[in-house]
């Protein structure tokens, strides 16, 4: 990034674990194998090395929460680790508006939306969600925009098996923005561990692969 002299960098989540990976609230029978391995990793083994290198970049740098940031800590702890004030936000750069979303919420047994927290989300399949307040905020951001828009998220923003459970609410909002002449140009996510290009309503949705590739 330094050599290419890019205008900014952003990581799209599942980027770093906290230093201590010994505490997880997920029931053992629901726990995926990668969490079990992480829990066995000694605290003294560096886990923030890549994050520290990322933060050395001399130009603007931005973070986004993935689900795995909350495997061994609360969402508040994950935000603190990345120096983020809020889990979703927007920024402007060189005539573009960039929107960063947070899809790390699930519905509990009472039907309430709950933040991912110490791996507890692995006990349910009713996920992921954008919260109602976030959707209201996003609608205001889109309808007040005067610049072309790029949306970043961890989970896909189009209908697919690993995408948002309330993707219809999001897509309705996007269609409303497009009908109002708002220039939503591009949406980018990861989470799926594959490279995917998806076109819908004139918008390119790009899923970025992971270093570990598909598994």
Q: Where are each of the predicted segments found?
A:
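Residue-level marker for buried hydrophobic side chains located in beta-strands
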Residues: 9-11, 63, 151, 188
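Short acidic, glycine-rich surface-loop motifs adjacent to enzyme active sites
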Residues: 11-15, 140-160
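Active-site glycine-centered loops adjacent to acidic/histidine catalytic or metal-binding residues
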Residues: 13-14, 66-67, 154, 190-191
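Short, solvent-exposed loop/turn segments at secondary-structure junctions
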Residues: 18-19, 72, 158-161
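Extended active-site neighborhood of metal-dependent phosphoesterases/phosphodiesterases
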Residues: 21-144, 169-185, 194-214
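Histidine-centered catalytic micro-motifs
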Residues: 151-156, 187-195
């Amino acid at each position: 990034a330094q050599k290419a002299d890019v205008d900014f960098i952003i990581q799209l989540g599942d980027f770093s674990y906290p230093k201590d990976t010994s505490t997880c609230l997920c029931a053992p029978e629901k726990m995926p194998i990668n969490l079990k391995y992480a829990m066995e990793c000694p605290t003294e083994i560096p886990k923030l090395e890549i994050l520290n290198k990322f933060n050395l970049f001399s130009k603007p740098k931005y973070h986004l929460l993935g689900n795995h940031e909350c495997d061994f800590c609360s969402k508040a702890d994950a935000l603190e680790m990345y120096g983020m004030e809020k889990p979703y936000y927007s920024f402007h750069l060189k005539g573009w508006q960039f929107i960063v979303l947070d899809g790390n919420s699930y519905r509990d047994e009472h039907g309430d939306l709950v933040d991912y927290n110490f791996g507890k989300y692995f006990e349910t399949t009713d996920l992921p969600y954008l919260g109602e307040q976030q959707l209201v905020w996003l609608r205001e951001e889109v309808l007040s925009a005067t610049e072309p828009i790029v949306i970043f998220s961890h989970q896909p923003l189009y209908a697919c098996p690993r995408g948002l459970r309330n993707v219809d609410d999001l897509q309705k909002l996007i269609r409303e923005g497009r009908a109002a002449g708002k220039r939503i140009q591009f949406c980018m996510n990861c989470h799926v561990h594959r490279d995917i290009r998806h076109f819908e309503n004139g918008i390119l949705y790009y899923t970025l692969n992971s270093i570990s590739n598909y598994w």
